Every structure is written in structure tokens, then in C-alpha cells.
């Protein structure tokens, strides 16, 4: 083959791989099996090794490379990359729009806005010349940023070449690099396991990952990007609408936020603000507000800029999720398994529109790692329904009399000894069900929906039953009578009858629900199901050894030792015997023959998004019946991801890891066959 033929073969392979990458990473529509992709990629690598004269910087094989020699060298933006002015109230938004209308000298004009979520990530500028990515930079001071080209190339959804046959001579594409929330939590959890540094928040994680001297470190981080505007553009006619320019970016091969909307006037902008504020906690990524941009590019050009911000756009910030306050004391709460958790008492402060006076400190390892002391000025975070937490200490504000936090020697509830094993971060009260705090939490767990499901037995009633000495252990619940219950404050005869009916109804259960309800440490729903499938009744389970238990899927040495320890305790066996005597029972499980030829047998499967044909729990049950293991997170060990509509970060991570994606229609064919 002559040089021309070789070059044509290389270009054909590059174009094929770009097409596969675009469908896989951007559209989430894989065109070919992994093996075919790998074959094409390897063929391209071999060509480029044999004929290095045809190796080009836009080749898919150059997405991850060694340490760049020009790391963090300054890069000037062709068009300034300015920050947005912020508004925080409705009045400020009205004033911003009023100023724009007055500047345009069209007092009766209803302005049309492009509205977008304001991602809390790192802004970047990517420059393409002749359709090829030549360099990328951070925002920097707006005029000059840092060269992060090699690191940007590690983000799979960033096209190395634009997907058009007639690209602009030069174009700057602006976007926000971020780490999805689920991936951030998984990364930090893994880092903690390995004793490595964790990140305070997803934005810091994204920024730190992009500013790595070694691009391979960036490649190992779950970075993603949404593009939001065009900077300089040469020899190409752009649409006169910001929303249409975003559609053009999609055609070029970029990811654009699906939450972008068109709005008219103040009311339209405020509707979008409320919509995104309500949806904020369900999004797979962090946002700290919304952005309004006048949609007309010609109007944008008329308005121009003031100082270092555009007159045609602003950011409407959400109430802060992080605030600063003073830690004035530490109390200790006792959980179901005796875990003693430190809780910070704070000078009340408004965070995200809610007054916060308490925050979790997690455990003593976290207190030591963050060096938190009583009297410190601390930063607290409240995100959605998550319990507020102390994120960090502002050491410059530490008073001379700041006191170290001491682990109590005795339980604050029952006075029993508090112990902490050498290999555990958590300290525990050894009082067991003698401790009222543990008994209350145990009863609440026992009565919960996924356990015995005793409707009407809530935390207030549990407090009454325990505090007044009516209930001393779980079995006492099933010996309650109408008169005792009806005489309780705010109870009454009708409520008492309803509770007794719920208790009677709960007696018919399943073995796995009963095991889960017992609250054995390290045994959750999945572990209880595994034990129930293998042992069928209490008698056979209580004689199991650690070695036997460890042969079961999902039962490791720690869980196995807790199971053996639980059934070795005489008082636990007494409670179980009494519960069974009082009528708790379950049908003997039928041996179901699973077709081991089905594609899910023995595989690890993750569900994501919304399935139209069934709920998440029903889908999970069907997968378990097919012999699958259902996991809540995507990793390299995941075999399949079943994707419904509005799938988020799990789907992104699956595509980045090369995990097979199964659409709902294909899934339904198997479960209904």
C-alpha cells in the first residue's frame, strides 16, 4: 500500500472511532460492541506506530498522553472570558432587566431570555482551528488562563475534532467541567478507604483534577462537561440566537445542558428559577443558581459590557448551602447499634433558607482529621435533605480557649461503658437493649416499611412506650392491649385499635424481612435476602459458622462474624423465640428454578433513570428472580446498566467505563419471556 492509501486508511479509522465515541459518550447510543471498537482502536494505534508521519494531534489515540511540557503555561483568550454579575432577589432581577431595557431604549420591549442551570464547576475555554482542538485553558483572569489542553482531552465527551464537514476557521467553545454528585461521593469514599486525600466538594474535585501535571490522573477522575457559549468565531456565520447557537454546539459534537429553557420577561425567568430550585436536589450535578442571557445576539452586542461583566446576562444565585458559624458545644447521640455519634451545637445560622443550629460531626476520625474544636469558627454545609455537616475549620479565627472534643467514657443515655475498637472509626455503647436510645432506634427499625411494616408505630409513640416502661424489648410490642394503648396521651381507642390491627397484620411476613428487622450489624436488605434464601429458618441459621457464611454471595468476614455473634447471644435468642411464640411466621420458600441461560444470571446490574413499565422495586425484584445481583452504584465490576428515561450520572459513568447499556425495551423482553 502506498503512502496515500495508508493515509486514507488512517483517516477512515479515525473517522469511524470519532463516530463511535460521539454516539457512545454524547448520545448514549453505542453503535458497535466493545470488541469492534477495540479492534478499530488497536488498528489505528498500529498504523500510527508504523507510520508516525501520519500521527496527528486530533487522533483519538492522543486523548491521554504524558505530562505536557507546556503544563499551565499562560494562554490568551481570543475573546475575553468574563464573569457574570449576580442577583439574589426578585427586586435585583427586575432592576437588572429594567437597566437592559433602558439601555436598549425600547421601554415596551418584552425581552426573550435563554435560561440555563449555573453549574458549580470550573469554566474552561476550548479553541478549535480548522475543526481540530488545538488548546484549552481555564478562565484565569478573563483575558489569560492556564493551559490544560492535555487534561481536557481526557474527558471522553470533548470532541477532538468538530463533527461538521465545514468547520469555522477558528472557534472558542466555553463550558463548565464538573464531577457528578454520585461519582464525587464514590470517589471520596474510595479515597477514605485508601487513606488518601478527599475533596471538600465536587467543584474543588473538578478543579483539582484538571490542574494535574500528569493527564493520566485527570483521566482517572470522573470528569464531565456541559458547554454553554461560543467566544471568538472566524469565517463562520453564527445564528443570531443564543439558544440556536447551543443547538449548533450540539451539532458540532458537544454536550449541552438538557435543562436549558426559553423564557419571556421577569415572570418567565422567575418561573424557571423556581423550577430549577425545586429540581436542584434531583439533578445529578451541583448547581448554585441559574443564568439568564438575552437570547438575541444582536441585542447582546448593543448592550455590551460594564466593568468585567456583560450587561445582557446575569446569574440568579440560590440561597447558600454553606455558611460560617461558631461551634459552641458537642452532644452525643446513640444509634440502633450503639454507635455514639458526635453532634455539633452551633450558633444558629440560615443555610439555604433554613435555620441550622445542629450539624453532624460523623465520627472521631473525622473530628481528628479536620481538627475541630469547641469554640471554633466552622463552615457548615446543608444540601437538600442531607443532614447539615461541619465541613472545615477556619483556623485563623480559632480562639485561645478552644477545647478539644473528648470521647465520653460512658453512654450519655444509659451510663454503660463506651468502647472503640482499634480498627473502627465509630465508638459504641455496650448497653444493648438495656440502653433506651438503642431500644427506641431498634423498635423504629423493626417497624419500618422494609422490615415488619407496622403501620402507625412512629417515633413519638415509641418514645412513649419506652419512657413509660411499657415496652422493654421487641416482643413486648405484640403483647400490647387496647386499654394500655388507649390510655396513652393523644392515642384514643380508634388509634389503639388501628395499631393492634397493624401489629396482627405484620405477623405474616417473610424470613428475609424478619432477619432484616432484627437489625443484625452489617446485614442490610440484600444480606438478609441472601441468608434467607440459603437457610430458610432460624434453627439452621443460628448454627452457621463464619466459614460457612463467607461462602455466600455478599457475606464477607465482618458481616459473617456479626451474624454468628448475634445468634450466640442468649438474650437475642430469647427475643426471637418469644416473637415466634407470639405468632410471627412466614411461608416456607419454594425452590424456584432459574434459567441460568438468561443474560442476567450471576451478573451485577445497576438500574438508573425512570422505567415506564414498572417501578424501581419491581424491576429489582425481577432481576433478583433472574439470579442477578442488583447494585446501587456503577463500577468496573458492573456488568450491565439498565437505563430508563432521565438517566443521570450513573449512565455517564457507565459509558465512560465501557459498561454495557440495556434499554428498557430489551430488559422487558427478558423479564416477560
From Swiss-Prot:
Protein name: DNA ligase
Annotated CDD domains: BRCT_DNA_ligase_like, LIGANc
SUPFAM superfamilies linked: BRCT domain, DNA ligase/mRNA capping enzyme, catalytic domain, Nucleic acid-binding proteins, RuvA domain 2-like
Positions with a binding annotation for NAD(+): 34-38, 83-84, 116, 139, 176, 293, 317
InterPro entries, A to Z: BRCT_dom, BRCT_dom_sf, DisA/LigA_HHH, DNA_ligase, DNA_ligase_AS, DNA_ligase_CS, DNAligase_adenylation, DNAligase_N
Recorded GO MF terms: DNA binding; DNA ligase (NAD+) activity; metal ion binding
UniProt-annotated binding residues for Zn(2+): 411, 414, 429, 435
Source species: Legionella pneumophila (strain Paris)
HAMAP family recorded: DNA_ligase_A
Record's keyword annotation contains Ligase: yes
Active-site residues per Swiss-Prot or TrEMBL entry: 118 (n6-amp-lysine intermediate)
Segments traversing the membrane: none
Entry's family note: Belongs to the NAD-dependent DNA ligase family. LigA subfamily.
The organism's taxonomic lineage, starting at the top: Bacteria, Pseudomonadati, Pseudomonadota, Gammaproteobacteria, Legionellales
A GO CC term attached to the entry: cytosol
Top EC class of this enzyme: ligase
GO biological process, one term: DNA repair
PROSITE patterns: BRCT (PS50172), DNA_LIGASE_N1 (PS01055), DNA_LIGASE_N2 (PS01056)
BRCT domain ranges (all copies): 595-673
Keyword field: DNA damage, DNA repair, DNA replication, Ligase, Magnesium, Manganese, Metal-binding, NAD, Zinc
Record's keyword annotation contains Manganese: yes
Catalytic activity: NAD(+) + (deoxyribonucleotide)n-3'-hydroxyl + 5'-phospho-(deoxyribonucleotide)m = (deoxyribonucleotide)n+m + AMP + beta-nicotinamide D-nucleotide
Protein purpose: DNA ligase that catalyzes the formation of phosphodiester linkages between 5'-phosphoryl and 3'-hydroxyl groups in double-stranded DNA using NAD as a coenzyme and as the energy source for the reaction. It is essential for DNA replication and repair of damaged DNA.
Listed EC numbers: 6.5.1.2
Cofactor: Mg(2+); Mn(2+)
